[in-house]
Regions:
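Positively charged n-region of N-terminal signal peptides that target proteins for export
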Residues: 1-4
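Bacterial N-terminal signal peptides
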Residues: 7-17
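Boundary at the C-terminal end of the N-terminal hydrophobic targeting segment
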Residues: 20-24
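Extracytoplasmic "Venus flytrap"
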Residues: 35-56, 60, 71-82, 102
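Short, well-structured alpha-helical segments in soluble
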Residues: 79-93
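Periplasmic-binding protein-like
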Residues: 93-101, 121-123
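Flexible loop/hinge segments that line or gate small-molecule binding clefts
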Residues: 113-136
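Hydrophobic alpha-helical segments within soluble ligand-binding/sensing domains
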Residues: 135-157
Length: 160
């Protein structure tokens, strides 16, 4: 999952405005860091779904260093409050917003329509837009292993 977050943030950098050719002749200015926000459905605890997303956020910071500045808003209920928080982050100038709960998909899509310059990544969502992408875990890998284990534990060597 960390690789996916780093890749998504790196891809977002490709969509950011590039300075004009005329400005290239001037002395190179320091590039402002990408502003990335993460919206969590629960507080960050020692383990669990939100903890893993926060580990991914930390990996992004480690990989990109001064090239990224992250913001976290935790314990955001799904629904109207989620839309308010996501909209507020977009208004603050966040360039990419990761929403880490299925219930954030619709609010993120509504906010994305009003902020086409902001990129959104909805985790476990399935609806996309020009500035909204989706990501998900590879659940099938764990399910496959559970099936193999179930078959090996059965008397017949078959699951089911």
């Amino acid at each position: 999952m960390y690789k996916n977050l780093v890749a998504a943030l790196a891809a977002a950098c490709c969509f950011l405005p590039i300075s004009s050719h005329a400005q290239a002749a001037k002395a190179p200015a320091a590039t402002a860091p990408v502003r990335a926000a993460f919206v969590y459905v629960t507080p960050v605890l020692p383990a669990g779904w939100t903890h893993q997303h926060d580990e991914g956020r930390k990996a992004v910071e480690q990989a990109l260093g001064q090239g990224v500045r992250t913001t976290v808003v935790a314990d955001v209920p799904e629904g109207a409050d989620a839309e308010r928080v996501i909209r507020d982050l977009a208004q603050q100038g966040q360039q990419i917003i990761f929403t880490t709960s299925f219930g954030y998909m619709e609010p993120a899509l509504r906010v994305a329509r009003d902020f086409p310059q902001v990129r959104f990544e909805t985790i476990t969502g399935y609806k996309r837009a020009d500035n909204v992408a989706t990501a998900n875990a590879r659940y099938y890998e764990g399910r496959y292993l559970a099936g193999v284990l179930a078959a090996r534990m059965s008397k017949t060597g078959q699951a089911g």
